[in-house]
Amino acid sequence: MSSCALVQRPPPWRAAVAPGDGMVAVDGTQFVVDCGRTIFFSGFNAYWLMMMAADPALRGAVATAFQQASAHGLNLARTWAFSDGGDQPLQSSPGVYNETMFQGLDFVIAEARRHGIYLLLCLTNNFDNFGGKRQYVRWAGDAGHNLTSDDDFFTSTIVKSYFKNHVKTVLTRVNTLTGVAYKDDPTIFAWELMNEPRCYADPTGAMVQAWVEEMAPYVKSVDGRHLVTPGLEGFYGAGEHESKELNPWGIYYGTNYVATHRTAAVDFATIHLYPDVWLWGSSADEQATFFRNWTRSHIDATAAYLGMPLLVTEYGKFLWKEVGANKAQRNYFLDLVLDAIYASASRGGPLVGGAFWQLLLDGDIVAGMDSLRDGYEIILAEDSRAASIIGEHSEQLAALNGQDADVLCRRASSHRRTRLGNSLSCGGGDTLELLLRMVLACFVSLSRSISSFIVQNFILL
C-alpha cells in the first residue's frame, strides 16, 4: 500500500497530487506537496527577474536576489513570464519570440530551483507596463481588426488567439539549462493569467468572468499539473456574495471576487493590499481599519463560498517622502499583514501566504537597480528591521509546513464554529449560511478522503 493512499481526489480541473513529484496542489483550503502535506508561502515580488537575467552580465543580480530571499526564509517569488513588445520583448509580435529573453527566464527558473524557491509566473498585464492587454489590442489593430478599447482584449477572437498562443509557447518551453519543460517543472508553483485584471468597459464583471472561464481551462488543457489563478486584486462586483461596499471608493472594477474564483479551472484565490493608495489621503487608523475589514471579508468569503486557498500576492506600503511616509509606518504595515497571514494559517484558515512588493538589491552594488525603485521597494541588506520582520514570519510559517491537511480542516472548522457562533446572537446577516457552507465543505473533504482510501486500497488491489 502506498504511503500516500489518503491523498484527496481534487475537484475537476484541480491539479492532482502525484506522490513525490514535488508539484504543489490544493487540498480544500490548503496548499499541499507530495503526500498531501501542507506548505505555506512567505514570498516576494520581483517582476524584473527575466529582464535582468537576459543579460549575462547581470545574472549575478538574479542569483543574489534568490540567495538573499532564501537566507530570509522566503520560498515564493512572483514574477513576469511576459514582455509584450517594447524595447526588451519576450514576444516582439504575435508568435515571434526573443530567444535571449526566453533564456533569461530559463535562468530565473533554474536559479529559483537551486535556492528552493517556488515561482508564481504571470502571463500578461492589465496595464501597459511591459505591453499587456494594450499591446495585444494594438497588434490586432495593426493586422486590420477594428478594435476601439484596451478592454477588447477580453472579447476579441483574434486577441484571444494571440494570448492562447503565448500561453502554449511559454508552458511548452523546454528550459535550455535544466532540460525540463516548464509544464513539467515543480519549481513553478502556479500560472497567473493576468496581473490585476480590470475591465471598466463592463463594471458587472461579466467580460472578465467569461475570459477567465475560457482561459483557465485552456491553460489546464496544455498543462494539467500546475495550479492556475486569475490574478485578481480582490475587488468585489455586483454578483451574489460580493461585499462591494468594501471596495475602495465603493466603485466597481469590472471583476467579481467570488464568482470569478468559482470558475472550475481556478485553483486558488488572490487579493492585493495597498491601503495608502486605495484610500489616498486617509489616516493611518483609517487604513488599518480598511485592512482588517478587507482581509477578514476575503478570508470568510473564501472559506464559505470558494473552499480554496487564498494568497495576498501583492502587499506594500510606500516610502515617498513627499507624503511623510517612513520606514516605521511601513514596518507597522508589514506587521499587520504578516500577523493576519499567520493567524489564519496557524488555525487552518484559507489565507496561507503572501508576497510583498517588491524585492530590490542595493543600487550601489547592482548597476541599474536604483531605476527600479518605486517607493515600495524592500532592500533586505539595508533595512534590518523589515528584514527581521519578514525573516521571523518566514520561520513561523515554515514551522507549520508538513501538517496533514485534513487535521487543519477540522481545526479550522472548530475555530470558525466558535467565532461564527458568537456572531449568530448578534443577527449577523449571512452567518448561518456561512456556517452551513463551512460544515458542508469539510464533510465533502472528508468524503473525498474516504473515497480515495477505498479506491486505492480495495478497488485497485
From Swiss-Prot:
Source domain of life is Eukaryota
- Coiled coil: present as a keyword of the record? no
- The answer to whether keyword Hydrolase applies is yes
Catalyzed reaction equations: Random hydrolysis of (1->4)-beta-D-mannosidic linkages in mannans, galactomannans and glucomannans
Q: Kindly state the tissue distribution recorded for this protein.
A: Ubiquitous.
Chain positions recorded as substrate binding sites: 80, 195, 274, 357, 364
**One Gene Ontology MF term:** mannan endo-1,4-beta-mannosidase activity
InterPro entries given in the database record: Glyco_hydro_5 (IPR001547), Glycoside_hydrolase_SF (IPR017853), MAN-like (IPR045053)
Q: Which UniProt keywords apply?
A: Glycosidase, Hydrolase
Give an example GO biological process. polysaccharide catabolic process
Catalytic residues at 196 (proton donor), 314 (nucleophile)
Name of the protein this chain belongs to: Mannan endo-1,4-beta-mannosidase 4
